[in-house]
Amino acid sequence: MESRLQWMRQAPTLWVDWSPTLGGWEAADLLSQRYPQARVLRVEPAQARQTRALARLAPPRWQFWKATPQVVAQAPAGQAQMLWSNMLLHAHPNPESLLRQWHAALAVDGYVMFSCLGPDSLQELRHLYAQNGWPPPSHSFTDMHDWGDLLVQAGFAEPVMDMERITLTYPDAPAVLADLRDLGRNLSPSRHPVCRSRAWGQGLQQAMASPDSPLLSTQAGRLKLTFEVIYGHAFKPTPRARVASKTEVPLQDLKAMLGRRPTRD
């Protein structure tokens, strides 16, 4: 996603990194290198993640003259030229609200760059759960075309969507589960209503590695998961002038307009 910024004509003077603790610091570091003169505002709505972000960003003690970068719960309205969000949108419980927050944070002609998981993600794990009659392991992910529609509804213009499929392989079932925990939560309303037992977890790992498991890779002894990664960007346009729902014309003016004869050239 960072490489796509080369097509943006104007470099931002202020950009927002939305939830960098979830999106990863590698991309944030690349952006800081690309825009060394720009100010960066990190947004972490949750207090716990604010603390983690501050700990990660704090300069070493010997660099006492450097100020700790700012981490806030909400971005100021209408100031940023770019908003960056990596792998967050699919895990948000109210994505429509989040898109409106992004729109509010951007200045006119500013743009949002985001990535998220698409509907083909975790298809092997979904098949495994279905085979065993278990509730889905994850909520359903939104299609990229629907994200484009939601961007327009939130006030954005010229949305551009793209996607790619990535297959990751793992040495064993615990490695798969550890990666899934880092990716987020299962927001499906049909998920297990209570925590599963240790015995159930062991059964899950055995099913993942069984000879008929959909997760088995062509590489001997490894497990695979497919991820559909959606990329999107859109601009915040100049606000349109509001048009009244009705217009009142005095009767005398209406009669005068109707009584005028058309002129000929």
What do these predicted regions represent?
Residues N86-H90:
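Short catalytic micro-motifs in class I SAM-dependent methyltransferases
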Residues E96-Y111:
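A short glycine-rich, Lys/Arg-flanked "PGG" loop and its adjoining helix->strand segment in the class I
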Residues E2-A77, M82, S97:
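Class I SAM-dependent methyltransferase SAM/SAH-binding core
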Residues A73-P76, W102, P135, A220:
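Catalytic cores of nucleotide-enabled group-transfer and carboxylate-activating enzymes in metabolic
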